[in-house]
Amino acid sequence: MDTAVNESLSISYNLEQFLIVLSVSLSIATLSKTVPILRKIPYTLLLVIVGMALAFVDVKLINLSPELIMEIFLPPLLFEAAWNLQWRNLKENWFPITLFATLGVVICVVGIAFPLSYWGGMELAIAFLAAAALSATDPVSVIALFKELGASKKLNTLMEGESLFNDGVAVVVFLILVGIPLGTSTFDLSVTLARFVTVIGIGVGCGLVIGFSLSLLTQRFDLPFVEQSLTLVSAYGAYILAENLGGSGVIGVVVVGMVLGNYGSRIGMNPRTRLIVSIFWEFVAFFVNSIIFLLIGDQIGLSSLSDHLNLILIAIAAVVVTRLVSVFGLSLISNKVSDQISSTHITLQEQTVLWWGGLRGSVAIAVALSVPQAIAERQAIIDIVFGVVLFTLLVQGLTTQFVLKGLDLIGDQPQRLEYAELVSRQIALRRVLAELEKTDEFPDINPERLRYKQELVQGQLQSVTDKLKLLLQEYPLLQEVANKKFDQTVLDIEAETYADLIRMGRLEENIMPLLVTLEGENVAEPS
């Protein structure tokens, strides 16, 4: 009886805490859009600042644990990013992303560990654990800023693609290294590489199996909310399955998200369902980020950080320098061989943004919190990671916008938005006018009033059309945007038709080669 009562009280308390966190987060979201001075601060960074203010006055919300971050918060965030990462963009930038997510992690781990050991006096094995945690990037606020300011698609893909795969690699490196200070394992290069490949391979395999299985399953029915629910199940399912099989859950989620976003959504979902699922995941990402960044700020204990201030300063300097070496050095290699294996050439301006925008966040914190209690220096590692995360979020995160503007990397996003709104308005007015011209459907309406409405809508349509012409004359590149949207629409119609035929049982073969061919033809067409 007492156990049941205690469990009931625990559930009630946790629910109250959750509602408090949610209320604070949504209040900040509202203020960030209504108070002019707050509009200049990225939403996620504002959450961290408010969380720190709560921690300063000793208001503790929910305690962050590695399980809460890695198993509850991280899968939906990874899936949403992977769902929206287009394969064609990833294919164009695969080589630099691969370099950043593999060799880049190695450079960061080595480049952070040795300064912490040499100048900070940490045991080298412990320093490597802190370095592994800090090698995981989490540029959520920077990517949101890219989208808001209209940075290039290439910059978005490089930053987000690196982050997705980098997180998985960093977590695997940490898991391999954590046994060394505990004395349960020793470092052997061949064994370590074999384990690394195995863990990554299991994650990729789980993601592929779940992704393609669900893609084929959703071809057989058209139930938007069921398909939406299946994507949620796939995100957590891929993580749990990969982890239970000894693989990387992070890599599993990334792979299943990419498969469903680029393949499953094309062959198994109609445009309406794709829109519903995309909006759902946009909401989930906003919801989770709202909670996690507030909690990150709330977990930062300034008094504890001051105890390890020298280590934090060394780590900050090492993170900034190793990120610089990693981005500029690997970009140089990528650019040298871009003509042979990759079409991407990363400019110095883009390299600068990639360097400065390599923030640390929730993944680094989750890894640090998962350091075993048996390691005496556990609190020092946690303080180092929290200190670096705080610096990257508040200093680099708040100044990235000025770096983008200073390097003239702000795109034509305002014009694109205006163009999209005008086109949408034009389509809507044309449909309204077409309905008004069906006079027999309005027998009870006075003909004069009907004619007046037709003339009014016709005038509005002409005004919108004129604005579109002027906008295209002033910004000719918008025509290229229109052409790409048209190509995508044609591809969607083709995919939807094949999916309908499969559901009817009239087609059973894999349609992906047909879609790739069609996409290639569209790309090759003259604009």
From Swiss-Prot:
First-listed, main subcellular location of the protein, grouped into a coarse class: membrane
GO annotation, biological process: potassium ion transmembrane transport; regulation of intracellular pH; sodium ion import across plasma membrane
Pfam family, one: Na_H_Exchanger
Transmembrane segments: 18-38, 41-61, 94-114, 126-146, 169-189, 196-216, 240-260, 276-296, 311-331, 352-372, 380-400
Function: Na(+)/H(+) antiporter that extrudes sodium in exchange for external protons. Might be able to function at relatively high concentrations of Na(+) ions. Also has Li(+)/H(+) antiport activity under K(+)-rich conditions, but it might not have any physiological relevance.
Protein name: Low-affinity Na(+)/H(+) antiporter NhaS1
UniProt organism field: Synechocystis sp. (strain ATCC 27184 / PCC 6803 / Kazusa)
A GO MF term: sodium:proton antiporter activity
Cellular localization per UniProt: Cell membrane
